[in-house]
UniProtKB/Swiss-Prot annotation:
The keyword Phosphoprotein applies. Residues 168-231 form the R3H domain. Residues 391-422 have a biased composition (Low complexity). Keywords: Methylation, Phosphoprotein. Gene3D superfamilies: R3H-like domain. One of its GO terms (molecular function) is RNA binding. Pfam families: R3H (PF01424), SUZ (PF12752). Residues 111-146, 267-287, 331-370, 387-439, 490-537, 583-625, 797-825, 941-977 are annotated as: Disordered. It comes from the Eukaryota. SMART domains: R3H. This is R3H domain-containing protein 1.
Amino acid sequence: MRMSDTVTVKDETATMKDLEAEVKDTTRVENLIKSENYGKILVEKNEHCIENNIDLQRPLQSFGQTGKRSKSSSKLKLVRSLAVCEESPPPPAPEISQENQEKIQIQLTQSFEKEEKPSKDEAEKEKASDKLPRKMLSRDSSQEYTDSTGIDLHEFLVNTLKNNPRDRMMLLKLEQEILDFIGNNESPRKKFPPMTSYHRMLLHRVAAYFGLDHNVDQSGKSVIVNKTSNTRIPDQKFNEHIKDDKGEDFQKRYILKRDNSSFDKDDNQMRIRLKDDRRSKSIEEREEEYQRARDRIFSQDSLCSQENYIIDKRLQDEDASSTQQRRQIFRVNKDASGRSTNSHQSSTENELKYSEPRPWSSTDSDSSLRNLKPAVTKASSFSGISVLTRGDSSGSSKSIGRLSKTGSESSGSVGSSTGSLSHIQQPLPGTALSQSSHGAPVVYPTVSTHSSLSFDGGLNGQVASPSTSFFLLPLEAAGIPPGSILINPQTGQPFINPDGSPVVYNPPMTQQPVRSQVPGPPQPPLPAPPQQPAANHIFSQDNLGSQFSHMSLARQPSADGSDPHAAMFQSTVVLQSPQQSGYIMTAAPPPHPPPPPPPPPPPPPLPPGQPVPTAGYPASGHPVSQPVLQQQGYIQQPSPQMPACYCAPGHYHSSQPQYRPVPSVHYNSHLNQPLPQPAQQTGYQVIPNQQQNYQGIVGVQQPQSQSLVSGQPNSIGNQIQGVVIPYTSVPTYQVSLPQGSQGIPHQTYQQPVMFPNQSNQGSMPTTGMPVYYSVIPPGQQNNLSSSVGYLQHPGSEQVQFPRTTSPCSSQQLQGHQCTAGPPPPPGGGMVMMQLSVPNNPQSCAHSPPQWKQNKYYCDHQRGQKCVEFSSVDNIVQHSPQLSSPIISPAQSPAPAQLSTLKTVRPSGPPLSIMPQFSRPFVPGQGDSRYPLLGQPLQYNPPAVLHGHIPNQQGQPGSRHGNRGRRQAKKAASTDLGAGETVVGKVLEITELPDGITRMEAEKLFGELFKIGAKIRWLRDPQSQPRRHPLCCGSGDNTANPERSKPSDLASTYTVLATFPSISAAQNALKKQINSVNKFKLRTSKKHYDFHILERASSQ
């Protein structure tokens, strides 16, 4: 229903006249009814006139609200009153009613004029005022206000409701409020809250549409509406317009959609059908696509005529297990290579793992694509560790078969991890560069076993001999019973040694033969070209360390016992980086002589014209028949920037199951990359004593900075690890290794610092003398600060470092005179010794340095990082027994879990390994992805030192009569890893007053003394004078008279409070919150050995 735009005033006036006539008739009818009911009233006409006036005013008052109802009812009454009017004419009351009606209308007009605000158009206002006598005022005002703009209200509202969702909500809200206002008879006017001009315009139009009078208040922000006689409720609500619009649009869309879909209806059905088929056959189709992709990839590679082999191999591997395995290899290889281009080559070479090896050729190079080199798996779990093999030792950096095209052969990132290797491949014999004149070279045959890594090392000058072999076992090997045959978990077949016999697992402590072996016949050492230093790189892989959390390298000595040291020494090397996986390398004991199988064929000699490497180190007085066991556990790193795996002799019981995976050790070698200056690596290895068995371990740790040894000046002090070697009670010496000029390229030291045997150097420390080797931070020394403390007899004041010959170079390490200071005082003073070692360029693999029997490792990189490793001597003489295991603390940047290292006998002190802090990565060390490039393999200690350390744990000086000195007090501290809970009784005292001395500070600790706490003073290494560097110095008052000076500042010490119990330490922490002290207690960020802290007590 649409309302007309305008209603003329003429029509309105005629309507009013009709209404007035109807009111008159109604009055007559009412008079007749009253006359019938009340006969007395009919006689008295005057009373009739009064009643007529009253009745006339009553309908006029209610006219504005009940116009239609009065009209309809008057019509009904009009029909009844016609006949009655004929008989009794009406009295002259209409005249009076007209006068009263005009008076009432005049009053209403005046009231409307007062409430209505003057319009903007004055002409329209005057026009409206002229029409006032025509009896319709409020209707005119609303229509004139809205119609002046020429807006069709109905059309405007309908379009707004359909097209503008935001205005639609506003209109619906206004509609509801106006409906509520109209339905409420109590309030004639309503004032809306202030709103914007656009919303006020909407409100004006909605009010006009409802027949309301609408104006704004004095502020001009709010709209006021008033009820009028024309107020109405439209027949259609706003919602109905919206519904109609949606219905029409929906119908239109439906029609368009049906028309458009008629063209591609068949295509859509086909697509849906294809999707359904694909959904039901996804597995089968993937298998087919996978096979087709492999066929296509392999068909592209026509080198070495591999097509026929691939076809035959695919036919053999049709079974489900082979398919699953190859899918896994392909998937892992794709993830490891990281490039789609790499997956082609690496997948091809993975398939070649199953082929039989072709004869080795010294002419093999990268261009020949020796794909039958076994790949190095990237084991996502520790269930399978595949082989790491070396194909040849010719010195050619390209001799290693490419596992994936990494884009740069010089980067040495050879090999993308290719999943699990299950094929047992026969070894490719190879030679290693000579380690020393009497050391056995390390030979790495390509024994492609899944969970074991086999390294063969023979005597110097021998070819690949099965006399010694190393097997890399995963963490699960710790729980394997002795004598078990190692079985490949992927194929279910036992691992095969190079000689064809199954691999039998025997822990180092057992005396059972691992496999029947005979030493190979001695042969002259094969020449190795110095110009190809990267020939013998061992591991070349992007992320090798993630597979080897703990690499166990077990050495099996020769069966006939020709090696005098094989029966006494075992090698232990812990390889571990902060956030990667590590393994323990252990050496197997000499087996009983079994029936000797034929040894593998020796490798062919290298091309002539290449120099033969000379002996790396002299025998130090040992006869040639008794070669010094330098080769034990030593992995040769011929690459200039390859790390050295230092394996010092020692015992390790492989049945301990406490190993935990730690961040991986990355290996990398720069292949065919000429260096501006040949790199050197400082190696540390001990020459075993002829008469004693010992336990040794090299703690080579890789920090988060991915760098250990750096050739950059002012940074090597942060790079080199410390080594502590126990000897007899003698003063400590300071050895400084200067770095050289600033312009030297980044190098790694391959020329080791050699400590010859006592038989050759009378001035060297005698047997049993503790030698402390540590590193002073770069802040104290500008050059390489490698402090070696020799506890030597007072009479010996010089240590002659003999000339040593690099294995692969004619250059020799010049003999260095280590001149000691004045003789040690009788009270046990420190005598400093300076050792200057220049940077001799070495282009070959570094030779292992030589040490004495008992070894301690002290890391003074940041002061309190000294760790002592208790010596275990005479292992063969004493019955080996396992004592309580020790878990050394984790490295602070990244705590890593390491298994416990058990000592050989309970009476001997346990072996504890402490970490070193992270160091920044030095440019020039190689790619940052390969953290061990150009540096020794790292050792990362375990997370928590569990406190069940035997009482024998003490400083080495106490074992050798050096009880007067307390050099190793700070050896018991090490950083705790992030997130570790401190379990102990030691709290650190911090926030002491500035400038306070040590004696004054002790007076402040009265409250702590009352509860039984003991104060330990550990000197800060940064605060020590450079001319008095202490390897493992303590802060005891009795250790050094200098310590007790009144001017000794407390800020130069790390103050620790040891409480009698953990609860007492916790109570002290709680009490300090409420008490006002001049110091603060906090849980120490380091772990401290209580037995060694006892010597640092100030009480």
